[in-house]
Amino acid sequence: MAKKYNEDYDIRIAPEFSGQDSNLRTTSKSQKYFLIFLVAVGIYSGFQTATQYFASELQYSPYLGNAMFYIGDVPIYFPFKILTSWGDIIKAYPNLSEETYSIGYCGSAPFLIIALLIKFFTSNKLSGNRFLHGSARWANRKDIERMALIPHKLTFEDKVYNLMPWHKKKIKEIKPEGVFVGAWQDPKTGEVKYLRHNGPEHILCVAPTRSGKGVGLVNPTMLTWMYSFVATDLKGELCALTGGWNKECANKYYIRFEPAKKRQCIDEAKGLYNVARWNPLEEIRAEGSTEYCYDHKTDSLKKRICDGTKETADTQNIVTQIVDPKGEGLKDHWAKTAYELLVGCVVHLKHNCPEKCNIATLSLMLAGQIDTAKIREKYMASQNGDTSSIDDESDDSDTMDVKNLWEDMAKGLDREGKPYKARDAAIIAGQHMKDRPNEEAGSVLSTATSFLSLYTDPIIAENTSCSDFRIKQIMNSDKPVALYLVTEPTDKDRLSPLVKLFISLVLTLCASDMEFEKGRSVKSYKNKMLLMLDEFPSLGKVEKMQESLAFIAGYGMKAYLITQDMAQLFDKYGKDESISSNCHVNIFYAPLKTETAQIMSDKAGTTTILEENKSISGGGLKASTSRSMQATGRALITKDECMQLAAPVKDNLGNIQKPGEMLIFTAGQPAIHGIQPLYFQNPLLLKRAQIECPAATDIILKNGRLISEIEEEEKQKNIDKNPFEI
């Protein structure tokens, strides 16, 4: 029969390995040093005992020479004098010399016997490489401190260092901050520590539905994160629990972008509404448009007029997401030609009807409901002072033959009748539509309009008609921005293209314009940003996310991606996905699928344990037993043990009463066997969550200008009107 020695393996308690000892069960370095010490003490004790005995028998004769020191009136001699200077004296007393040596042996014997026994019992055990089959282990406190998930505890040496007056730079215990990745209970003290990650690296959390990831990771993070963030929020629960604290206490702009919710006025005098608007086409850096950027030299925002060099690129990026929301590429002729047409139409609309340039207007223009040529005529007439030709606004929507649109696009003129930099896209698209046969042109047009069907919903059309904020303002505002991207479960699939468009533009626009000074990159943003994307794979394949994770950290963006299962991630991105490999920290709750459990076990690795084999031969009094021990490999945590990780304990109403277990993997470090943190068990976090969510969303921009800039101008006008008023 076989018996496995599992003292070094326990899923609950981390084994304390030094990480430097390469022997499995042989004598350690400390044991070797102790054996050497025992032998040395034994030799010293034997010679000292023999020397003192010989001297006492000669009544400490003066002929013995000087003593090392005295204990009372008793002289203590150098222990090895019986081998050196006392040699002639010992020869004169042969009987006494035998007794002296016998006494010396007795003085050494106890220490040498102890050393031999220790050596016997340790050498009787298996020797070899301690990590023969694997070196996996659970992380201890020092490992977790090295991962920077808990603050470094000041050691005695650190405290002594701080007391020295000539050390001007003191060692400080870092205050914990960052996103929550779990909690850990110290097996020595029983103390529970929150694990918080504040580095630029990304995080992937794998947790089934109703497993406690919201109350354990998402809510605590949103109630402590002091910088900007974009959070996907299904049903608006996250917004309700964390929006109040972020606006009232964290001093952030509170923005609730819920495309499918009816816009209602909250405060007419202040122009406040329940949801914010966002127009994707206003993100295009068109020629003459305004952009607000961060100036690292002055640590402030600066206003910049765009020169139009990035207009075509921005338009193509937006149209790509509209035409190919699944990220599968433009596979057929109709999709490719529709893409070309939409790029040209957006550029044309941007320069001929900039005040109404949105996707709903774009679909109306393609339906022949907007005559851009007439708009140009009226605008040019108004600029020349001819007001007689200006009709009601309803005339802007007069129907027109769509063929006239292709003619107008092919001219490449803006509403002032002048050519513009990005006109090539409009000219080419218009000319190609003119040259196509009617049937083909009709098919291209119908394909293009089919991609815009989402924006025929009047609620979505209103909420995307203009922008109360721009994406770059999330990281480049005078204070951080808390942006909640809210979708109802019934609208999740329908709104998926718009949500993916928003996220893709965040990754595109916020990861640009890196500057360098003295051979190093400098910060190109005012506030760093967290992307908290819950149920990330349910959005569909966001190819831009998979491509961007490798470099967006350098632009101040940190992604926190949450999925229910690894199979869900594989379904959207394939087995060779690069999302998990670009996430420095991987968090796992108890899985429901064996595929995910196997991944967890593989990540934890293999450890080396001892296996004892015992065989019995014979019987009765003649029975004999032989034992042998060998090293064998074992998964640090097996697949079935992963699936049996303790789940949260819930009451009959489904409320969590006791946290469950979790595994945290950090690149290059041992795995952490942790417990789930619960925000409502922390009085401070619970108090923050009880702050009422604002009814109205904040507005950062109005007509493309910062609200703060407009208010400052109005304030200055009032001062100029009343120069003597205090």
Language model features with spans:
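Basic- and hydrophobic-enriched, low-structure N-terminal and domain-boundary segments
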Residues: 2-211, 215-218, 264-270, 280-284, ...
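Short alpha-helix boundary/capping motifs
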Residues: 21-22, 77-83, 476, 580, ...
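Short, exposed beta-strand "edge-strand" segments with a Pro/Gly-rich flavor and a Y/T-containing core
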Residues: 25-26, 121, 126-157, 275-276, ...
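P-loop NTPase motor domains
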Residues: 46, 51-56, 122, 185-188, ...
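Glycine-centered flexibility motif
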Residues: 165, 182-184, 279, 353, ...
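Conserved ATP-driven motor cores of ASCE-family P-loop NTPases powering translocation/secretion/packaging/pilus
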Residues: 549-551, 555-663
